Amino acid sequence: MTVFPGGPPQAEAVLRDAVAMGADDIYLVTDRAFGGADTLATSYTLAAAISKIGMPDLIFCGIESIDSNTAQIGPEIAATLGIADVSGASFISFEKEGGLIVTRQNGSSAEVVELKLPAVVTVLPELNKPRYSSIKGILGKGDAELHIITAADLDIDTARIGIKGSPTQVKRVRPVVPPQKENLRIEEKDPQESVDILIEALRKISVI
């Protein structure tokens, strides 16, 4: 199993944790030239890196990142490499003939998809629980060779990477302030009068 994200040098710590959990090889696709990339430029870069180390039978991607939540990287890698893709996988079984049967979530329903390898599968968190790191893995993770891939290592069009290759750019991020709800305070001492006021207020907002 090979683990390989795109990210800053600080991602090395996560990769070494992956070794402790059983990963065989770790790669880090990192370069200042990749900075500011949107999903299109990122997937192009990762697809080029995958092609460099050799096409695997199966590529797993998380369904989405926790920052932009686009869920586009996996499908775009598949499109760039020209291989099959299934998104939102919640269960996977392997066929003897070298294919996959994938259960994917589609809103409130589920679909069962059969596909041939090589393929990209983007997975939901509930697909599997990560294994615990072994003592041997923890002790040996610092000795694992980390392979660094930079822009100079790839056969790519530099106009398609980083911020230059990104047709979409984030100009501003601002919090969404939810509308304030109007509060109702009933100060009448008579219980029946208080109930009448409450009922009338609920009718005005179509609750009853």
Residue ranges and their predicted role:
Residues 1-208:
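N-terminal glycine-rich FAD/FM-binding segment characteristic of electron-transfer flavoproteins
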